[in-house]
Amino acid sequence: MPLNWTISSVNSAQALRWIEILFAVSLVIQTVEYLRMSHATSTQGLWAWPIQRLDIPTAWVRRFLDICFQPFCHQMHLWMRCVSAGILIFIGGSFALIAFLFIGNLLILIRWRGAFNGGSDFLTLVVLTGLLIAYGVGSGVDADLGARAGLWYVCIQSVTSYFMSGTVKLLRPEWRSGRAMIIFLNAAIYGPLPPRHWLSQRFWAVIGSWAFILWECAFPF
């Protein structure tokens, strides 16, 4: 569907199409990150499947996942994910395409034994579920009803998640004082912060913490 960029005339189908495009761009970024980490997921890597498979108790499930997570199959899945995201951007979604991405995302979550990027992975699952609802209801009942149902699902999940996150931060003294911000940044992938980094100063840490708290708590409004 061609996009109409006039905000006043946006309908459910147009809004869903915008979400598809933004989501697909995010999906490409995530998938490129996974592809760049192929050395870490090899049989000799830090996240080797022969070790992680020991957590799977059911034999037939373990055998099925052994096939899915062979290095070649896993890489092919990631490349197919990129191609599917491209189709989502330039052509648009379908129930089959979204179902493939949804099942593939579940496999990736299993591969990492849960969320790899935390909130990003959670929101990926939320948007995929919303799109699955939209195309499932749309193909079986009504396209506009499906689009509205999918959008409502994504909105409710997103708004409540951010609001709850902000509320928890508001109740925690380490977030109100800025200490949690410094701890988080020091433990991040690019941390620890240099001793004289401006974000390690308490004043800026407090500003940053309260910016997050207020932004997340104000999300429903």
What does each model-found stretch correspond to?
Residues 1-221:
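Alpha-helical membrane-anchoring segments
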